[in-house]
Design a protein with these regions (language model features):
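Aromatic- and carboxylate-enriched substrate-binding clefts and catalytic-loop regions
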Residues: 11-15, 26-27, 172-409, 414-417, ...
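Solvent-exposed beta-hairpin/edge-strand motifs
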Residues: 492-511, 600-624
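Short linear, low-complexity motifs centered on an aromatic residue
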Residues: 132-134, 161, 169, 418-435, ...
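Carbohydrate-recognition beta-sandwich/jelly-roll modules
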Residues: 1-180, 198-206, 218, 271
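Carbohydrate-binding surface patches
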Residues: 403-411, 448-500, 504, 543-553, ...
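Aromatic- and carboxylate-lined catalytic core of secreted/periplasmic carbohydrate-active enzymes
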Residues: 312, 400-412, 417-446, 539-559
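C-terminal beta-strand-rich structural cap/linker in extracellular carbohydrate-active enzymes
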Residues: 518-574, 593-597, 625-671
């Protein structure tokens, strides 16, 4: 229960419950809650509590009932945690635990709660590092639902093999550096998504060369449900149930994924995506919710095989309990946080809260494939076979920025000849290595609690260097302008941070301009934006996107890399030190890559009424011959940049100008 002047929010299938005492029949929101969602309750001051299962995630849940001792006060309730009624039996000596974590700040409390579950998982799992996963660390091309080539669309080609080979060639000729390609389910023998796949053998009409490395690229591969009539039924142990569209199953034999992943990695698989997770539990089958072992055994076997073969996992269409259980699955680095990006519905609106929830549990939130074309440019012949067959994308800047800043997979999905290279290169180096933020995109605390912004979709990603934070802020469907202050960005995570910052609007294809100074006493305003009305037939922007940077001790501001979503990506800048005399940066890049670093040397004049911030651009080019190599065989060089108010910024390949010791752990994270 809460006081009437305090708001209450919670995660419930991406639903915000609102104020506890103002939700009619509020108990109906919770009764029968069988999806395993954690409950986040908070007041307007940010005092928060998270309650969830701490074990047996597949078969546990919550319920609520009114407190009959006080029938007139609908703000009182009795909350229950326990096992689901879907269980048909419980073993002797069975134990179940729940956990309650309380703290100050919504982001901070969720992270503390996630730390607890990761520890209780007993597998030593840490939060994902975006540069420890080949797929997350590199630009890719995707063919799943919403992609141009979904369902094997290949107008003008004899088959999909020919289409993808030509696509690869065309992107190479355009210097668009994709490093892997995702195959969805359209190439394999199946009986549809449900009841599922029959085999992992390609249909000859799609891939004449069969299951082989004919493409010559690393692959992200996929499985929907598994049909109970698949070719492996007599070779491995399965749990099978009947659904209206036929029998469906999950493998319980540890050898199944060992053999499947051995085959996949033989042709270049670097990631395996398990889709339709929601259908295995509360959805069509109940395969994982009728006993206490099946779900655990199924995903544990998948994880052990992934570890054995050095690949990572993506969960797709998960319920909340799959995400909680992912704290025990070492190989899962990301999970889908939206519906399929078919441009038909506003599924991207869930990215803020899900980004926060997912990362608290150790994984990154994925928002699916993206198109890069300009507004209303039709991609003729696309494979979007959903009802409205939308073959255009008018929200590309929002989709692409969110996909990159969330730290989930960034997979372009345009048809050949449609890809906007300018937009794509906001994401990565010239060799296709991604430039990501250290902290992924997530809802900010004040969007839950503060009366002037409550309910606003305001998300931010961050890069931190010591006490200095650079933020990338996105507002979606804002009905009013939202005030932003330095403390609203820091959220108590950094002590001694600068209280004066600058901000500018991010506009694709344009350099940094229109820089404004803001502070605690003089906030900047995130402008209001239009709703995501479909089919996006509106002239005004559906989102607002600001970048923000601190004023450093010498009065300068390093705005960061021009024309990148993460202007100060920790994948580019491995060291920054700021003193009252100078700012020193160590940066890494691909051979012969040129970067543009925007900075301001005159912010100390900010109190002058006539002050107009001046932006300077420093252009640096990395050597053509680099000698260092990262874990993915990417060559890279280092450049040092020194900035002083009087002389501006200058770059050098000479290590002698670097007076700062490199932090080993930061260097290791990107290499």
């Amino acid at each position: 229960t809460t006081k009437k002047d305090h708001s209450v929010g919670l995660f419930l299938s991406n639903t915000r419950a609102g104020e506890w005492d103002q939700v009619p029949n509020y108990h109906e929101l919770f009764t029968g809650d069988t999806y395993g969602q954690p409950w986040l309750l908070h007041n307007s001051h940010g005092r928060s509590a998270v309650w969830s299962s701490a074990s047996n995630y597949f078969v546990s849940g919550f319920a609520v009932e009114p407190d009959n001792g006080d029938d007139d006060d609908k703000s009182h309730a009795i909350l229950h945690a326990g096992l689901r009624t879907t269980l048909t039996s419980i073993p002797a000596d069975f134990r179940h635990t729940s956990v309650l974590v309380a703290g100050n700040g919504i982001n901070a409390t969720l992270m503390e709660w996630g730390d607890v579950l990761l520890h209780l998982g007993g597998r030593g799992k840490k939060r994902a590092n975006v540069y420890d996963d080949f797929m997350l660390a590199h630009l890719g091309y995707w063919t799943d639902n919403g992609a141009y080539h979904y369902r094997g669309a290949h107008d003008g080609y004899q088959n999909m093999e020919e289409a993808l080979l030509d696509l690869k060639k065309g992107l190479e000729e355009s210097n668009i550096p994709i490093r892997y390609l995702q195959w969805d389910d359209w190439w394999m023998e199946s009986k549809g998504d449900i009841p599922g796949m029959l085999s992992w053998e390609p249909k000859p009409d799609d891939f004449p060369s069969g299951f082989s490395d004919w493409l010559g690229l690393p692959l992200a591969m996929y499985a929907p449900e598994y049909s109970g009539e698949n070719v492996w039924m007599h070779d491995y142990d399965w749990k099978v149930v009947k659904v209206p569209r036929g029998p469906t199953a999950i493998p319980l034999d540890p050898n199944f994924y060992m053999d499947l992943f051995r085959n996949g990695t033989s042709i270049g698989m670097i990631m395996f995506e398990q889709d339709f997770l929601c259908s295995y539990g509360i959805g069509d089958s109940g395969l994982t919710t009728t006993d206490v072992d099946s779900g655990y055994q199924w995903l544990r076997n998948m994880d052990e095989a992934a570890i054995q073969f050095g690949i990572t996992l993506q969960f797709c269409m998960p319920d909340a309990y799959h995400l909680l259980h992912s704290t025990q699955i070492v190989s899962v680095t990301n999970a889908r946080a939206t519906g399929d990006n078919t441009r038909e519905w506003r599924s991207i609106l869930s990215m803020g809260q899900n980004g926060l929830l997912f990362y608290a549990l150790g994984v990154y939130a994925s928002c699916d494939n993206v198109w890069t074309t300009n507004a209303h440019e039709e991609q003729v012949g696309c494979g979007n076979f959903n009802q409205s067959r939308l073959c255009y994308e008018t929200n590309a800047p929002l989709d692409n920025a969110v996909a990159v800043l969330s730290n989930g997979p960034y997979g372009i999905a345009d048809g050949l000849g449609y890809t906007n290279k300018t937009l794509v290169m906001y994401s990565c180096r010239t060799d296709g290595k991604m430039l990501r933020p250290r902290w992924p995109l997530a809802s900010l605390d004040f969007s839950f609690t503060m009366s002037d912004t409550k309910g606003s979709l305001v998300w931010a990603a961050h890069d931190d260097f010591g006490p200095y934070r650079w933020s990338y802020v996105i507002g979606v469907e804002l009905s009013n302008s939202v005030p932003i202050t330095p403390s609203r960005l820091v959220q108590g995570a950094i002590h001694g941070y600068p209280t004066t910052m600058v901000t500018w609007e991010v506009q694709v294809g344009k350099p940094v301009s229109g820089v404004m100074v803001f502070s605690e006493s003089s906030p900047c305003l995130l402008p209001k934006s239009r709703p995501l009305d479909l089919p996006y037939d509106i002239p005004a922007s559906s989102h607002t996107h600001l970048a923000m940077a601190p004023v450093l001790p010498n009065g300068m501001v390093i705005l960061g890399e021009n024309r990148k979503w993460a202007t100060m990506s920790f994948g580019r800048i491995v060291q920054l030190e700021a003193t009252e005399y100078a700012v020193t940066l160590e940066i890494v890049g691909a051979p012969f890559e040129t970067i543009e670093l925007a900075y301001m040397a005159n912010v100390s004049m900010q109190h002058d009424p006539a002050f107009t911030p001046l932006v300077d651009i420093l252009t640096c080019t990395f050597p053509s011959s680099c000698t260092e190599i990262d874990k993915y065989a990417n060559l890279y060089c280092r450049i040092w940049i020194v900035c002083q108010p009087t002389y501006g910024c200058d770059c050098s390949n000479d290590v002698a100008i670097n007076s700062v010791r490199l932090i080993p752990e930061v260097n290791a994270m990107i290499n």
